Amino acid sequence: MKRLIFILVISSHSFSDQIIEKFQAANGRYNDSDYIGAIQLYEQIVSEEWQSGYLFYNLGNSYFRQGMFGQSIWAYNKALKLSPRFENIKYNLEIANSKIKDRVTLPPEFFLVNFYIKLKSYFTFFEWLFLCGLLVFLSASFFMFSKVLISNIIVVRRLILILSFSAFVFHLIAFDIFLEDSKETHGIIIFDNVHAFSGPFKGESTRLFTLNEGTKVSVLQNQGNWFEIFLLSGEKAWIPIEKIKVI
């Protein structure tokens, strides 16, 4: 398992001194093997709606050390959404996933699909938007430059075409991420032996199957204190809200 992150990389306007002190105190408790204490402090920071890949990464490590594998998988997935290029998160997530009972292994994707998935997940949604804006700005700048340039105007026009096409592709990727986040919500089962039912009522519903801790599911809708979920196997069922954490 990869090590803890001791420095929270943030701007001075993002996290207050109090949050930084809590983060450092949580790291200290982790180093003293007080994982419950570390979890409590990290969760306090999360409850104050501060978002950081490093925060969720350290929280995931604390959950893992405490044997709370479902919670650690949830935290690592949250961290990966915020810091998609941080390799330690991917490594620790793989270790945590290996602890899942009856883990479902999907067949390998077609190489072009796999390439697109990796490309799309390399940046966050807002990073893709920033790149789009940057390319549009460069295209406009070179276009204005081409109006006063006499020599090599063909080269400049080709460069404008490449930048414009790249901006268009990046916009499509950003839009795809937006649609995916809007239409599909995922969650992690955080308890073991969670019973899934045919409807959102225990007494009137049939028990369909049992889910293991750490299983990743798609959340379709909620009704009262229940979530309707969808599994990779194609099955649908209802489980109590407290049994799952939404990513």
For each feature predicted by the language model, list its residue ranges.
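SH3/SH3-like beta-barrel superfamily modules
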Residues: F209-E242
